[in-house]
Amino acid sequence: MAVGKNKRLTKGGKKGAKKKIVDPFSKKDWYDVKAPAMFNIRNLGKTLVTRTQGTKIASDGLKGRVFEVSLADLQNDEVAFRKFKLITEDVQGKNCLTNFHGMDLTRDKMCSMVKKWQTMIEAHVDVKTTDGYLLRLFCVGFTKKRNNQIRKTSYAQHQQVRQIRKKMMEIMSREVQTNDLKEVVNKLIPDSIGKDIEKACQSIYPLHDVYARKVKMLKKPKFELGKLMELHGEGGGSGKPAADETGAKVERADGYEPPVQESV
């Protein structure tokens, strides 16, 4: 063997020497996730992203990230079977500003409502809000016994089911078409749509456990930062300054000059 051809010796290291282990978290940053102003609790938690390196920007990795949060955590409430999806639309400093992206009921709640001896009625409709968001709403309701009913079962006839389904679609369309996304979310939080449907269908067949069980976001308008800031209560539409930020006029004598400071 020729001299100087032993590659292992020239490199000066053992074969299979261990690489230096780098902690992956040392290259990452924590960002705060902020919910829109419709909810009582704005700070949802934190999310992790790799720091900006070259052309790979951290904020691009955060945009489009979806968070699923229980309504109980958003409203500091006991009722925990409603889940809201929030999507990151912009990053300001260390804050991820989110917007509504969908709603769902928990699996255990849906399973607890389905029982024997009653009719389950479902409906869905695609509706556009006044500010251009296309939503698909799903509704569910169950028949219940009439007052003083002795019979064990409470099944609705096919014609009644069709009437109730038609009424569900009408109410869902009306509630969404006439409002913008912010007002629609404000109706989904207490589920006033489900209560309206229950009230309207009493004349056809008594219902209970009526809920807007799911909301899907199908299409969004072009992203506008101003609208997102309004949702987060930071970009006031009026343009007026806050009470404590307004300036006051100061009276000065003619020919007034400020004193010369010794040090700056």
From Swiss-Prot:
Statement: the UniProt record of this protein carries the keyword Ribonucleoprotein: yes
Keyword terms of this UniProt record: Cytoplasm, Nucleus, Ribonucleoprotein, Ribosomal protein
Any GO CC annotation of this UniProt entry: cytosolic small ribosomal subunit
Cell compartments where the protein resides: Cytoplasm; Nucleus; Nucleus, Nucleolus
Biased composition (Basic and acidic residues): 242-255
Residues covered by region (Disordered): 233-264
Ribosomal protein in keyword set: yes
PROSITE patterns the record matches: RIBOSOMAL_S3AE
Matches recorded under SMART domains: Ribosomal_S3Ae
GO molecular function: structural constituent of ribosome
Gene Ontology biological process terms in this record: ribosomal small subunit biogenesis; translation
Family classification: Belongs to the eukaryotic ribosomal protein eS1 family.
Role according to the record: Component of the small ribosomal subunit. The ribosome is a large ribonucleoprotein complex responsible for the synthesis of proteins in the cell. Part of the small subunit (SSU) processome, first precursor of the small eukaryotic ribosomal subunit. During the assembly of the SSU processome in the nucleolus, many ribosome biogenesis factors, an RNA chaperone and ribosomal proteins associate with the nascent pre-rRNA and work in concert to generate RNA folding, modifications, rearrangements and cleavage as well as targeted degradation of pre-ribosomal RNA by the RNA exosome.
Oligomer and partners: Component of the small ribosomal subunit. Mature ribosomes consist of a small (40S) and a large (60S) subunit. The 40S subunit contains about 33 different proteins and 1 molecule of RNA (18S). The 60S subunit contains about 49 different proteins and 3 molecules of RNA (28S, 5.8S and 5S). Part of the small subunit (SSU) processome, composed of more than 70 proteins and the RNA chaperone small nucleolar RNA (snoRNA) U3.
Protein name: Small ribosomal subunit protein eS1B
Gene this protein is translated from: rps3a-b
